[in-house]
């Protein structure tokens, strides 16, 4: 199967690198100096799971790609989704599936509306991956888990989801085929929102969230509020969402930070709209009280407007 990775950052670059190491047919979409470096020197992967490798992976801009792909992983940031619509339309054939791997809830249905003729699934990822240099991706720690599935009513070619799962597992990625992807993407959104917002509010790595005290209490407050929103939206949590979020945060490398935090620190575009302000808007719409979210939002109102 042919894989196309739209967005070769920490997430997309890690997926591409692992697939390439397993001999799968993968092409990367990137831009700027990062793309030039991948084209000239190969993609450098520094991975706690796989070691260090330089991989010759075909790479191009979205505009220049003119092939077809069986599976398109969308790994751009939430604010860049519109930029890859034309790419999806060109690269898809009748059985192609698009798997968005974004931190922002509701991405699958949002892309599906933009490309109604293509089969769009939904997905999320648990990984610490980031661009550590031009043309270089670092994957930290032991967690690399990909969750994907189709929304109710989406028709997928029989056996395709399982075939993708097998390829990813052969590449060394832990994969869950989700029977309820709406639930699983909400759970991921709730976690990454609490993680990124806490980290950015206090400007600390995750080790500080792992210790008892005010910072951890803020993370718990945010998790409690998003859990209340999830319950109101009919999300069927398999376990207590707050203890789940704490379990995940406590497994992270103490040095790790969320990509939103890194972007804010550098003055780059960030996912603060999707991870903070969209959460607040959704909660207000549902009449959920969110004092912790409102408190942290005060700090970021200026940066967003």
Where would I find each of the regions flagged by the language model?
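Flavin-binding catalytic cores
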Residues: 159, 163-174, 215-238
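NAD(P)+-binding Rossmann beta1-loop-alpha1 motif at the extreme N-terminus of oxidoreductases
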Residues: 1-51
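NAD(P)-dependent Rossmann-like dehydrogenase/reductase catalytic/cofactor-binding core
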Residues: 220-305
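Active-site-proximal catalytic alpha-helix in oxidoreductases
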Residues: 182-210, 214-227, 253
